[in-house]
């Protein structure tokens, strides 16, 4: 086998230290990939796969090394595609100039790009954070840390007790991490790794105990965030520090650069924000719809009218983390109210923020050392909008807006420095020159002058030498052998100064050089390289100067982001006729003419019908809601939940009036979202979710329960539904505010026996044999289920519908309700091997009021099949 070339030996040594990454190996103007990396990259990136000899004196029959490559200046888009597919990419750069290197060019890894450590704009969503997560779990509790490397934003929380894993999974829902580093304890929890894979499509790896050592974690936290931030962590509860320590260790190992923009640590404990489990986030469609997984049609789609990327990210974070403190809620909603009341100034603020660049991510790239000239001009353009924003904000008397005015630094000095140094339209690359503005640096100007007018410079020197020596025939020439020279005819050679050095004797004269001429020649011939190097040096110095002010810029960016998010809330409130809710700790939820914020936006052919809601601390704590499917029960219940959530975000709400007593959690059990991919039955999924809700809810929670017990037999389902309802309503067991939709009409009797329970139903208007859903919630229970009418609306064949009406009439004539009340579970309907008489008996035993529309349709279909036989 042929001996490996020095370059291939170097490649294999570097690859050995990065076995889990695709290695981008810099060779000249390309990043090359070899062997298995080349095969994988060529497939994923649609690159042509070639090959090369792997050693010296390789024989033709010896196997060649697979190889593919990409231009280094176009690498961002290729890296983005690999990261989107979950790969890690190790960037190996040339650490010295190949032109001056002695022997093999030194190369090393400058960073490893992973899904959770991306900073390039091509890989990121402007209005979503990109979080790396560190999770530590042991028998005592656990911690979770989240960091968006592109902005430096860092959050940390910890839990203890038996529900730690559940709480941490709920925290994952707030941040939707792109990548997770797990301790041994966390890595062994299948429930956690399944959620990371199935729900978040998140790359994860076992960080091992090495990355999560407590002493090293505490040292790194102190160094990164400062002593004051470290002191806020809970003493005696190391899980938080170890989670953050594992995350920091991973960053240090993969990034190999300055991370000083990661400086502010947000440590929060349970009880600061409303906790939402994954089911509630999914069912309430907070950031994406259930079906299409798109933003359009979600609550975020309605609320997000922000004008800046950082404002969009902040508004999303408010949606993911509704507040529990009445003081904090009031502070935010007061700012929104002030903006609502001052239309002119609000619109001027919005106009001023339109098109303002992503200052948070720009300063992240600047500190990171990857920002180019265009990033600096974008930052300058954003900064130039700040004085006007500050002036507009200063006109408000609201406390929070006044604080934002003070926090907003106009950064005139930094924008001025950028304007002075960087040209208006800098090139893409910072290493090719043309980035520094004319007039900023004398040496750059001189070298550019030499480049642009080399002949002119020599002509100037020729004129100067003629004048100095008095030799009229003196001239400066150039050839490839001697370079530039001074030629003097024989008639004047006696006048040549002693400083002239003879280089060549001619028939008619002599050729000389001077030190000044040689220096000028060197400048002309090397001016291009020197001006490019000097421009990069000046640019790097300016970039570092800006990086040194990262704290100022981040604070201002946060102020702009908050102003943008508040203006979005105000604009949405004005354009959608929202009201400011009263928020307190009364335990009361009172809503007058409430509307679903999303449904009312997507309705095209009809107006949304508003509804009232009252849920007290003692009376009307539990609402049993009956009525046919398609009538609006689920929409109404989601509407109440969303209004409560919006109020606790500090937003105005879609209602004429709203009084919201703070709830600590919102739970939802809505069957339409059943995910059966794990192989569990619908009923098992339902019971698991209900179990989680009953174990985690408190008396201050809001429960949305839709069709509990629908996935099993009639009596089983009714028994479970009643038991759940009693558990929720009874203050001795739970006593939580509950909206409980059901098709089990027998449960409506509980209004008379279960304190705090009240019946509501969806109003229906009959017109001949047709029905019209009025979408209005009214007191009392539904008089019937309207299952056949729903089947007709769904398009069931008319013959089946008419037959169903006949069967229903027969059952009603036989007073089926009394019969059902007395029957036992052993009387379940069986359709196997029935005669016509047995089919009729089955119909007689059936109670349509206890069937959902889908169950009724299924029963009709099977009965018809048996009769046909």
What are these regions, as identified by a protein language model?
Residues 329-332, 352, 356, 454, ...:
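Intracellular alpha-helical coupling/juxtamembrane segments of multi-pass membrane proteins
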Residues 1-338, 354, 358-367, 371-460:
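Charged catalytic and DNA/RNA-contacting regions of genome-maintenance
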Residues 141, 212-222, 274-278, 286, ...:
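Amphipathic heptad-repeat alpha-helical coiled-coil/stalk segments that mediate oligomerization
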Residues 35-38, 237, 307-308, 318, ...:
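ATPase nucleotide-binding head domains, primarily ABC-like/P-loop NTPase cores
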Residues 172, 177-185, 191, 206, ...:
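Conserved catalytic alpha/beta cores of large enzymes that bind or transform nucleotide phosphates
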Residues 38-54, 147-175, 494-525, 605-615, ...:
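Extended active-site and interfacial segments that coordinate phosphate-rich ligands
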Residues 372-375, 848-869:
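Short, amphipathic C-terminal "tail helix"
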Residues 92, 115-124, 258, 394-400, ...:
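Active-site phosphate-binding and catalytic loops of NTP-dependent enzymes
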């Amino acid at each position: 086998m042929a001996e490996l070339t020095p370059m291939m030996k170097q490649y294999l040594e570097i690859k050995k230290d990065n076995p889990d990454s695709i290695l981008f190996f810099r060779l000249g103007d390309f990043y090359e990939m070899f062997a298995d990396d080349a095969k994988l990259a060529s497939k994923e990136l649609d690159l042509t796969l070639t090959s090369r000899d792997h050693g010296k004196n390789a024989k033709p029959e010896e196997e060649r090394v697979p190889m593919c490559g990409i231009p280094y200046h176009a690498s961002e888009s290729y890296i983005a595609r690999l990261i989107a597919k979950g790969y890690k990419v190790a960037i190996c750069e040339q650490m010295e100039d190949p032109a001056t290197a002695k022997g093999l060019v030194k190369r090393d890894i400058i960073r490893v790009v992973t899904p959770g450590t991306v900073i390039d704009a091509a890989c990121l969503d402007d209005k979503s954070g990109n979080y790396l997560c560190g999770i530590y779990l042991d028998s005592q509790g656990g911690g979770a840390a989240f960091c968006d490397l592109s902005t430096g934003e860092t959050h940390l929380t910890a839990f203890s007790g038996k529900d730690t894993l559940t709480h941490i999974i709920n925290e994952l829902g707030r941040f939707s991490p792109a990548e997770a580093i797990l301790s041994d304890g966390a890595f062994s929890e299948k429930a956690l790794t399944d959620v990371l894979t199935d729900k978040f499509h998140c790359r994860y790896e076992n960080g091992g105990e090495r990355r999560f050592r407590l002493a090293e974690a505490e040292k790194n936290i102190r160094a990164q965030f400062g002593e004051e931030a470290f002191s806020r962590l809970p003493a005696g509860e190391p899980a938080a520090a170890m989670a953050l320590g594992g995350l920091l260790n991973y960053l240090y190992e993969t990034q190999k650069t300055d991370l000083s923009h990661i400086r502010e640590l947000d440590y929060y404990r349970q009880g600061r924000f409303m906790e939402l489990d994954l089911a509630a986030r999914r069912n309430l469609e907070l950031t994406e719809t259930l079906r299409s997984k798109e933003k359009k049609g979600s609550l975020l789609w309605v609320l997000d009218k922000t004008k800046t990327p950082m404002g969009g990210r902040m508004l999303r974070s408010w949606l993911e983390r509704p507040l529990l403190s009445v003081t904090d809620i009031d502070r935010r909603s007061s700012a929104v109210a002030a903006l609502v009341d001052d239309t002119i100034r609000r619109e001027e603020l919005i106009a001023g923020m339109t098109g303002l660049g992503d200052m948070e991510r720009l300063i992240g790239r600047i500190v990171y050392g990857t920002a180019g000239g265009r990033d600096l001009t974008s930052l300058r353009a954003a900064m130039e909008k700040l004085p006007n924003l500050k002036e507009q904000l200063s006109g408000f008397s609201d406390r929070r807006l006044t604080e934002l005015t003070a926090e907003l630094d106009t950064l005139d000095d930094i924008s001025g420095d950028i304007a002075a140094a960087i040209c208006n339209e800098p090139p893409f690359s910072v290493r090719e020159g043309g980035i520094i503005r004319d007039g900023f640096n004398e040496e750059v100007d001189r070298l550019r002058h030499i480049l642009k007018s080399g002949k002119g410079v020599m002509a100037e020197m020729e004129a100067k030498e003629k004048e100095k020596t008095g030799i009229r025939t003196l001239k400066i020439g150039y050839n490839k052998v001697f370079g530039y020279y001074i030629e003097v005819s024989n008639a004047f050679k006696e006048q040549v100064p002693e400083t002239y050095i003879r280089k060549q004797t001619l028939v008619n004269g002599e050729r000389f050089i001077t030190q000044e001429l040689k220096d000028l020649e060197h400048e002309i011939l090397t001016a291009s390289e020197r001006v490019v190097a000097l421009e990069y040096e000046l640019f790097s110095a300016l970039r570092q100067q800006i990086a040194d002010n990262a704290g100022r810029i981040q604070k201002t960016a946060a102020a702009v982001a908050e102003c943008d998010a508040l203006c979005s809330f105000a604009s949405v409130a004005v354009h959608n006729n929202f009201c400011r809710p009263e928020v307190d700790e009364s335990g009361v939820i009172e809503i007058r003419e409430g509307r679903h914020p999303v449904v009312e936006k997507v309705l095209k052919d009809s107006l949304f019908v508003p509804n009232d809601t009252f849920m007290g601390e003692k009376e009307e704590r539990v609402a049993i809601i009956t009525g046919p499917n398609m009538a609006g029960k689920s929409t109404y219940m989601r509407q109440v939940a969303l209004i409560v959530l919006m109020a606790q975000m500090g937003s105005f709400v879609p209602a004429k009036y709203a009084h919201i007593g703070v709830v600590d959690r919102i739970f939802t059990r809505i069957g339409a979202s059943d995910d059966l991919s794990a192989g569990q039955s619908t009923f098992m999924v339902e019971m698991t979710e209900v179990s989680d809700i009953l174990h985690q809810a408190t008396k201050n929670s809001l429960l949305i329960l839709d069709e509990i017990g629908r996935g099993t037999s009639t009596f089983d389902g009714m028994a479970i539904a009643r038991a759940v309802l009693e558990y929720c309503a009874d203050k001795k067991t739970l006593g939580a505010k509950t909206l409980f939709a059901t098709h089990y009409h027998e449960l409506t009797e509980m209004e008379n026996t279960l304190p705090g329970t009240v019946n509501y139903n969806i109003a229906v208007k009959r017109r001949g044999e047709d029905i019209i859903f009025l979408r209005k919630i009214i007191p009392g229970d539904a008089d019937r289920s309207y299952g056949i009418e729903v089947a007709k609306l769904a398009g069931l064949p008319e013959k089946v519908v008419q037959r169903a009406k006949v069967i229903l009439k027969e059952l009603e004539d036989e007073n089926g309700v009394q019969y059902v009340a007395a029957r036992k579970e052993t009387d379940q309907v069986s359709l196997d091997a029935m005669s016509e008489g047995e089919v009729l008996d089955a119909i007689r035993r059936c109670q349509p009021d206890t069937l959902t529309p889908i169950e009724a349709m299924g029963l009709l279909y099977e009965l018809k099949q048996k009769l046909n036989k």
